[in-house]
């Protein structure tokens, strides 16, 4: 099963509803409870400058892209056991695809 095409406008709504309480996604934005996600696309796990990651995040050693984000956002604690991200995940594949499309667009 492939990853569906995402709609960044729908993804922005999901980000505002489910992510923005803990994350920013703007160039030079401050970290909140979670790291600023600007530039996350193409970056290795646990690498946002100035954010205190768990050893689990730093040690995962993958690069964030459509495939890795799609799997992670379904169940973050399963994908990176020991992460401090408390969000349970997005079970619907289309919601994950929309959110990823927004993250990719907003973090360039």
Curated annotation (Swiss-Prot):
<dbReference type="GO" id="GO:0020037">
    <property type="term" value="F:heme binding"/>
</dbReference>
<dbReference type="InterPro" id="IPR036909">
    <property type="entry name" value="Cyt_c-like_dom_sf"/>
</dbReference>
<keyword id="KW-0349">Heme</keyword>
<dbReference type="InterPro" id="IPR002327">
    <property type="entry name" value="Cyt_c_1A/1B"/>
</dbReference>
<feature type="binding site" description="covalent">
    <location>
        <position position="22"/>
    </location>
    <ligand>
        <name>heme c</name>
    </ligand>
</feature>
<keyword id="KW-0813">Transport</keyword>
<dbReference type="Pfam" id="PF00034">
    <property type="entry name" value="Cytochrom_C"/>
</dbReference>
<feature type="binding site" description="axial binding residue">
    <location>
        <position position="23"/>
    </location>
    <ligand>
        <name>heme c</name>
    </ligand>
</feature>
<keyword id="KW-0679">Respiratory chain</keyword>
<keyword id="KW-0496">Mitochondrion</keyword>
<comment type="similarity">
    <text>Belongs to the cytochrome c family.</text>
</comment>
<feature type="binding site" description="covalent">
    <location>
        <position position="19"/>
    </location>
    <ligand>
        <name>heme c</name>
    </ligand>
</feature>
<feature type="binding site" description="axial binding residue">
    <location>
        <position position="85"/>
    </location>
    <ligand>
        <name>heme c</name>
    </ligand>
</feature>
<keyword id="KW-0479">Metal-binding</keyword>
<comment type="function">
    <text>Electron carrier protein. The oxidized form of the cytochrome c heme group can accept an electron from the heme group of the cytochrome c1 subunit of cytochrome reductase. Cytochrome c then transfers this electron to the cytochrome oxidase complex, the final protein carrier in the mitochondrial electron-transport chain.</text>
</comment>
<dbReference type="GO" id="GO:0046872">
    <property type="term" value="F:metal ion binding"/>
</dbReference>
<dbReference type="GO" id="GO:0009055">
    <property type="term" value="F:electron transfer activity"/>
</dbReference>
<protein>
    <recommendedName>
        <fullName>Cytochrome c</fullName>
    </recommendedName>
</protein>
<dbReference type="InterPro" id="IPR009056">
    <property type="entry name" value="Cyt_c-like_dom"/>
</dbReference>
<keyword id="KW-0249">Electron transport</keyword>
<keyword id="KW-0408">Iron</keyword>
<dbReference type="GO" id="GO:0005758">
    <property type="term" value="C:mitochondrial intermembrane space"/>
</dbReference>
């Amino acid at each position: 099963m492939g990853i569906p095409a995402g709609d960044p406008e729908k993804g922005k709504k999901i980000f505002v509803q489910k992510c923005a309480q803990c994350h920013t996604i703007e160039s030079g934005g401050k970290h909140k409870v979670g790291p600023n996600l600007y530039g996350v696309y193409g970056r290795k796990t646990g690498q946002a400058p100035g954010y205190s990651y768990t050893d689990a995040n730093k040690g995962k050693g993958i690069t964030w892209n459509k495939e890795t984000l799609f799997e992670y956002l379904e169940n973050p604690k399963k994908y990176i056991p020991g992460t401090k991200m408390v969000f349970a995940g997005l079970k619907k594949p289309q919601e994950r695809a929309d959110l990823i499309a927004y993250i990719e667009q907003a973090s360039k």
